[in-house]
Amino acid sequence: MRQSLTFIPTLREVPADAEAKSHQLLVRAGFIRQNTSGIYHYLPLAHKVIQHIQSIVRKEMEKAGAAELLMPVLQQAEMWQESGRWYTYGPELMRMKDRHGREFALGPTHEEVITSLVRSEVKSYKKLPLTLYQIQSKFRDEQRPRFGLLRGREFIMKDAYSFHSSPESLDDTYNKMFTAYSNVFSKVGLNFRPVIADSGAMGGKDTHEFMALSEVGEDTIAYSDTSSYAANIEMAEAVYQGEEANPADFKELEKVHTPQVKTIQDIAGFLDVDPSLCIKSVLFKADDAYVLILTRGDHEVNDVKVKNLVGAQLVELATREEVLEVIGTEPGFVGPVKLEAEVDIYADLTVKGMTNAVAGANEADYHYVNVNPARDVSVKEFTDLRFIQEGDVSPDGEGTIQFAKGIEVGQVFKLGTRYSESMDATYLDENGRAQPMIMGCYGIGISRTLSAIVEQHHDEKGIIWPEAVAPYDLHLLALNMKNDAQKELAETLYERLENEGFDVLFDDRQERAGVKFADSDLIGLPIRISCGKRSEEGIVEVKFRKSGESHEVSVDELISFIRQA
């Protein structure tokens, strides 16, 4: 492609609203432009990268036995109402009405649509397993779109769905997809880790996320420093290694005056105790009920673990007004001892072994000391309810936990019968009995993967595209189009390289050499070939973007040199 004929609007200045490096570079290098908040144009270079990513994905999907189709973006509300997600998905679901008043949504995902399709066509176990996928635009009304393509309101996604007659069949497809995803992210050049994850609004049980390691990532990965264990911090099990409390050590419960002392740090300082000796009591609203969650003062409550424990659709921290109404005191003085409110109390495992601890007295300006949960608190269940911390023992027993930031680029789920039961998607088994289909779903963020690649592959000059996804193989520069020797050599090489099967971006613009070099580094194609002052001798400069190495090569040896590089 001649650069004079395509559309690559490069910029020298960093956009003021671009926080992430990938956002800055994709805008500056002429890959994307914002249409409105969270919605972007994919310009020709970005479109080519996306096509390369999609090609890699399609090959891996075919190897995994998945067939491609294309489903509607506009989805009728009735299907979402059948699954129940119309009422629980939240404001991120873009809803609308047609001229007749019928309700629709712009699909953030396609579980309902694919389940509706398959239930109408697949009636027998003989048609299972079946795996279908699409590459489609998705929509999510993000409250705060940010980081360019990493968190947008419109994005490109590959989503696959599998249907099975047995858990064993689902396991087999899940493992194939896990392998396919690992292959995809390796081939596109990402440094990634598969991690144990929470299924969130998707439902289901077993799930893994594929995280591209990056400081701009919004997710925290907890991983072992000596084993392969890795999990999203929301799901990482915090192992309890403490001992049981000894009643012989219990002191008499005492209420003490603690004026205006509301936080854990304040109460620890006021009473001259370590925060680990304080009991943190946090009231949550779980759907329409309230639960009191207890952790040690130096730990943080994991709301995802709370949600999974109580089986609620929505878990939120209770507001000050709700705490006053339910408990009868300010949040800073809430505690589990002599609690009159009829709420279930759940406690983290570390609380069970606490001895002579401090807790709120459910009265303004007062706390209890010498609180012993085994004696003084009626706990419904002790379980893991805290966020794991760096330095904790790894859940697999090997090594200690370290943290890293990651960008979620893919996720695989075992949905089970979550959607097939609610939407009555059944098949007849060998005995002629109707059974709910067992489902899996598998997503890759195509546009997010594009940004993640740039986050990991760049330097101070611009993007450094991995060969597998680069928009072009080569960047051919005629440094001075007014020089006949340079122009003629560049034109000859352009035709020859194209005939040899290379995808070439030919900079034939009437620009200064410095501008062409700067744009070439910014765009980041793997190899640059410059026709300059030695063009009359048949000598060109070949420069490799990743290593920065440059070589003077004769045009007769150019093709073999590039192929061997």
Curated annotation (Swiss-Prot):
It is an enzyme of class 6 (ligase). This is Proline--tRNA ligase. One of its GO terms (biological process) is prolyl-tRNA aminoacylation. Pfam families: HGTP_anticodon, tRNA-synt_2b, tRNA_edit. Its EC number is 6.1.1.15. Keywords: Aminoacyl-tRNA synthetase, ATP-binding, Cytoplasm, Ligase, Nucleotide-binding, Protein biosynthesis. One of its GO terms (molecular function) is aminoacyl-tRNA deacylase activity. InterPro entries: aa-tRNA-synt_IIb, aa-tRNA-synth_II, aa-tRNA-synth_II/BPL/LPL, Anticodon-bd, Anticodon-bd_dom_sf, Pro-tRNA-ligase_IIa, Pro-tRNA-synth_IIa_bac-type, Pro-tRNA-Synthase_IIa_type1. Consists of three domains: the N-terminal catalytic domain, the editing domain and the C-terminal anticodon-binding domain.
